[in-house]
From Swiss-Prot:
Catalyzes the condensation of ribulose 5-phosphate with formaldehyde to form 3-hexulose 6-phosphate. One of its GO terms (molecular function) is 3-dehydro-L-gulonate-6-phosphate decarboxylase activity. Pfam families: OMPdecase. It comes from the Bacteria. Pathway: One-carbon metabolism; formaldehyde assimilation via RuMP pathway; D-fructose 6-phosphate from D-ribulose 5-phosphate and formaldehyde: step 1/2. One of its GO terms (biological process) is one-carbon metabolic process. Its EC number is 4.1.2.43. Keywords: Carbohydrate metabolism, Lyase, One-carbon metabolism. This is 3-hexulose-6-phosphate synthase.
């Protein structure tokens, strides 16, 4: 099981500094969509140049022009790139092919997918490296949790890894870990904590069953 830190609401310099502080506890650091919108792919490059061992994920939420956008993210140092599960099959296949051509990975974000079970099966067959169930900010505000979606996707896929994101914090991560996902994505639960290092440490301990 891997741990990913998602950073959304900082600038690229602040994001790199936070990543440096917690890197020993996380496997992947994500430059979130808001940072990409504000600062572009150079934010991915800046992070890549300032951390040592963690992989870098560029949360582009690709919807079209998939092979080009994956290639650009990879050029700027991304190890993993995201595409939306509601994108066309042709886009998903092109993104998978482009990522794998460079030895990189593709994460498919299931946000707003209506038929989770069917789409997860299709994405699994298309070669997605990760399928991520994602309760976005707007649904978190309504009290929604990704647990049921996680169970649904885990029950039907054969090859892809399952990732889970959405409001996960150090005090709730054990419920997620109990479902045995391959990747747990924590954003504000670490980034907005009074002590981000301690929060990351607690999340890592939960993942390792300590």
């Amino acid at each position: 099981m891997e741990l990913q830190l998602a950073i959304d609401l900082l600038n690229k310099e602040e994001a790199a500094k936070l990543a440096q502080k917690v890197e020993e506890y996380v496997d992947i650091v994500e430059i979130g969509t808001p940072i990409v919108i504000n600062e572009g792919l150079p934010a991915v490059q800046h992070l890549n140049e300032n951390i040592n061992n963690a992989k870098v994920l560029a949360d582009l939420k690709i919807m079209d022009a998939a092979d080009y956008e994956v290639s650009q993210a990879v050029k700027y140092g991304a190890d993993i790139v995201t595409i939306l599960g509601v994108a066309e099959d042709a886009s998903i296949k092109a993104a998978v092919e482009e990522a794998h051509k460079h030895g990189k990975a593709l994460l498919v974000d299931m946000i707003a997918v209506q038929n989770l079970e069917q789409r997860a099966k299709e994405l699994d067959e298309m070669g997605a490296d990760y399928i991520a169930v994602h309760t976005g900010y707007d649904l978190q505000a309504e009290g929604k949790s990704p647990l049921d979606s996680l169970r649904t996707v885990k029950s039907v896929i054969k090859n892809s890894k399952v990732a889970v994101a959405g409001g996960i914090k150090p005090d709730t991560i054990k419920d997620i870990v109990a479902e045995d996902p391959d990747l747990v994505i924590v954003g504000g639960g670490i980034a907005n904590a009074d002590d981000p290092v301690e929060a990351a440490k607690q999340c890592r301990a939960a993942i390792e069953g300590k």
